[in-house]
Amino acid sequence: MNGQWYKHLIGARTIKTGIAIFLTAVFCMALDLTPIYAILTAVVTIEPTAKASLIKGYRRLPATVIGAGFAVLFTYLFGDQSPFTYALSATFTILFCTKLKLQVGTNVAVLTSLAMIPGIHDAYIFNFLSRTLTAIIGLVTSGLINFMVFPPKYYGQVEEKLSKTDALMYKLFYNRCQEIILSRLQSDKSEKAYKNIFNLNNQVETLISYQRDELSYHKKKECDWKLLNQLTKRAYTNRLFITHLSNIIYLPKNTRVNFSGDEKMALLKISSSIKDIFYDGSFKREDDSVETLRSTIKALEISGENQIKSHILYEVLMIYRLLDSRYA
């Protein structure tokens, strides 16, 4: 534990940003160029994955050129002491970046445009070319650093968040079944807990997409792909679980559903077996309880009555089936 403290203090992306800034400044100073514009570009180009850096860098370069071009143009027309120069440079840079679908580079383009205005004076062409060159230096340097230094590994984060998602899902499912048994079909507490789980699972899927991008850009062993596929399958199952869970949380208002004693006991046993997965590490089948709920659903389908009750029991059985397959 003590040997891992630094990972909580500074991350690989922070280190890569520092290295990119240092090398960018070195290259610019060696060429007698002002490094600040290149550094601005380098900072925003460090992305979670090498693929993202390359794709966004490809769009940030023309955006930066556009910003530098408008800075030179409006400085030539109004001078560097006019408010119009700053306002029009920023406005037209944003407008053109949006029209050309270069929004990802808008921020750095506007910053570059506004920052270079005071230093242009009469050297219009030189400043335009030098700012373009420094932008290229910043983009290339940060892109290479992001690709070569500390390639991101999100496996640990994904597994940690998946375990947390599992625990929260199972707990919420158990609590929601208790509410249903007690006829508390509207629950702000369950809705809030569901939203938290939903957002957490979105984070998992984002990290998995990052890791997949990294594997596609680096030569990795087959075991890396195998592990990623396992995590992806687990996240997909969680997504299905969450979807079915939402269907028993968000129910029509003023809904009334009555359950028999056997049905309540079946719901209790199934929800308890799912909740205990996190503590026991295994899934205890409740075949008799499942059969009880199936029989109820069939009876409701024949009579055509109480569709909400049938809907709730169906979703419970779908969740049970998902976990039965996972722990088969």
Swiss-Prot record:
Chief location of this protein within or outside the cell: membrane
GO cellular component: plasma membrane
Keywords tagged on the record: Cell membrane, Membrane, Transmembrane, Transmembrane helix
Spans traversing the lipid bilayer: 19-39, 61-81, 108-128, 132-152
Membrane topology: Multi-pass membrane protein
Keyword Transmembrane helix in annotation: yes
Location relative to the cell: Cell membrane
Family: Belongs to the UPF0421 family.
Protein name in UniProt: UPF0421 protein SAR1980
Source organism of the structure: Staphylococcus aureus (strain MRSA252)
